[in-house]
Regions:
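Short, well-ordered beta-strand elements
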Residues: 24-36, 55-60, 83-84, 360
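Glycine-centered hinge/linker elements that transmit conformational signals in sensory
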Residues: 182-191, 222-274, 316
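Long, aromatic- and glycine/proline-rich binding clefts that accommodate carbohydrate-like moieties
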Residues: 10-16, 27, 131, 315-331, ...
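Hinge/lid segment of periplasmic solute-binding proteins
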Residues: 10-22, 89-149, 219, 316-321, ...
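Short, polar/charged alpha-helical segment
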Residues: 14-19, 36-56, 155, 428, ...
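Extracytoplasmic "Venus flytrap"/periplasmic binding protein-like
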Residues: 47-123, 137, 160, 165, ...
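Extracytoplasmic "Venus flytrap"
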Residues: 15-44, 146, 416-419
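Extracytoplasmic/periplasmic substrate-recognition and gating elements
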Residues: 156, 263-269, 307-380, 412-413
Length: 465
């Protein structure tokens, strides 16, 4: 724990003014993906930080791929363009293996005058553990964390005529799907319902961009686990991917998962084969789908912001549909039911303003700024945030999104600890694109992806031929 005492607000302000004095007038440059969380940090929290410290922040929010390209090229070259970078949970292990990041724990020990009295690692949720190195030191300070739940149109699911028609056709009471067969039947029903009633409505979304890693991530992080396939289908002891060598990437479960997912495209809006996480949220918020797996960072605005969403007050939230046994595996710690996403800001070794950047990382981590951030961006990094009355009010408006994350978040998992994350993704994602376009069948795609994965992991030195 870096700090154990809390100070009155005026004392807090005095700390920031004094700590920022040596760096007053300098400009910190940061790069992040343009997400609800980062945009709130840029538009609100960064301005407060500047007012209290005199340190300016030039905050670049851009697309996911551009964000990574800019940050990695800067850190590889050591050019020092950026003083802080966004670190998504799934890439932290690659950054640590390449020694890109400043050790925050050690720096605060070495420079105690920079340690803010309002920065307390004990206040964070367990999500902070993802950003620690092998010795337990912190290399990134979380700024967002959220699950990827199942959203559904609560108004449609509660409509008496809809419920009657659904039960007449399928023989069970319409409710959020608990397994994949139910999900498919709901998708089929509402797609037909949209056609029959001349509505721009389909039964589901699919994050199936045929040329963007978003589709790969949807499958390995959100779909495959619900069928009982974890860690991308890799055997984490031998780094095998094929069933023949002890992996599960091309197992029967994995093939059933990919077949089901690709099959959902016939019940999804036409934009689905060009949809990343952003387009999925846009499709659902426009009322174009009856159900969807949506990154939680979008849950709040979809359910509450009438300026951006047409389904305000009409959104329900639930756990993803699961195959038998998957929930029990997750509850016992031997699996997970979906993706626990999020990110942190970290300081590159190449930064020319490390001390000032460290103040910024601590500033946005204060308990005092968490409530507004959570309400507006559906992210929670501090345990106490869930108990705040305003967050509880927003929980009601979102039909229980925050309480679902609090109570069931432990069933979700972050990305596996793969230092080769990026290399392997690039090697095997094209097979998933080919399955989406129909160039390969799901079975062919997984057989070829598994073989290519073993080839790549052998080349990288992880798997022995």
């Amino acid at each position: 724990m870096l700090a154990t005492t809390r100070m009155p607000a005026f004392a807090d302000d005095a700390f920031w003014a004094k700590a920022g004095e040596p760096y007053k007038g300098i400009t910190l440059r940061g790069v992040s993906e343009s997400t609800p969380s980062s945009n709130w940090a840029k538009d609100v929290i960064a301005k407060e930080f500047t007012e209290k410290t005199g340190i300016e922040i030039q905050f670049e929010t851009t697309s996911w791929d551009q964000m990574y390209d800019k940050a990695i090229k800067d850190m590889e070259a050591g050019s020092g363009i950026y003083d802080f970078v966004y670190i998504e949970q799934d890439i932290i292990y690659s950054y640590l293996s390449r020694d890109f990041l400043v050790n925050i724990t050690q720096t605060l020990k070495d420079k105690p005058d920079l340690a803010a009295p309002t920065f307390n690692m004990e206040e964070f949720t367990t999500f902070i553990e993802y950003f620690k190195g092998k010795d337990g030191d912190l290399f990134g300070v979380p700024m967002e964390a959220f699950i990827k739940p199942y959203l559904y149109r609560a108004d449609l699911f509660a409509d008496a005529a809809v419920k009657e028609a659904f039960k007449a056709k399928y023989g069970w009471d319409l409710a959020p799907a608990t397994d994949h067969k139910q999900y498919r039947e709901i998708a089929e029903f509402f797609t037909q319902y949209g056609q029959d009633n001349d509505l721009e409505l389909w039964g589901t979304t699919v994050q199936a961009s045929s040329g963007h890693p978003a589709s790969f991530y949807e499958f390995v992080e959100s779909i495959a686990p619900t069928f009982g396939v974890y860690n991308w289908g890799l055997n984490t002891e031998t780094w095998a991917a094929t069933v023949a060598n002890g992996g599960t990437m091309n197992s029967d479960k994995a093939k059933a998962a990919l077949t089901w997912w690709i099959g959902n495209l016939q019940y999804a809006p036409p934009e689905s084969t060009s949809s990343t996480w952003d387009e999925v949220a846009a499709s659902f918020s426009a009322g174009r789908a009856a159900q969807a797996l949506v990154y939680g960072e979008n849950a709040a605005w979809i359910a509450t912001d009438e300026n951006k969403s047409t389904v305000v007050g009409k959104v329900g939230v639930a756990l993803p549909p699961l195959e038998p046994g998957v929930l029990e595996e997750a509850e016992s710690g031997n699996g997970y039911i979906g993706y626990y996403d999020g990110g942190a800001y970290g300081i590159p070794h190449s930064s020319k303003n490390k001390e000032a950047a460290l103040l910024w990382l601590q500033y946005y981590s204060q308990a005092s700024v968490q409530t507004d951030w959570a309400v507006n961006a559906a992210r929670v990094t501090h345990k106490a945030t869930y108990d705040d009355p305003r967050v509880q009010e927003q929980d009601t408006k979102t039909n229980g999104y925050y309480s679902l994350m609090r109570d069931k978040g432990h069933l979700f998992g972050g990305a596996p600890n793969f230092p080769f994350h990026g290399q392997l993704r690039e090697a095997i994602a094209p097979y998933f694109y080919d399955a989406i376009t129909g160039k390969l069948t799901p079975d062919q795609a997984l057989d070829q992806a598994a073989a290519r994965a073993e080839e790549e992991l052998t080349r990288l030195g992880y798997r022995k031929a």
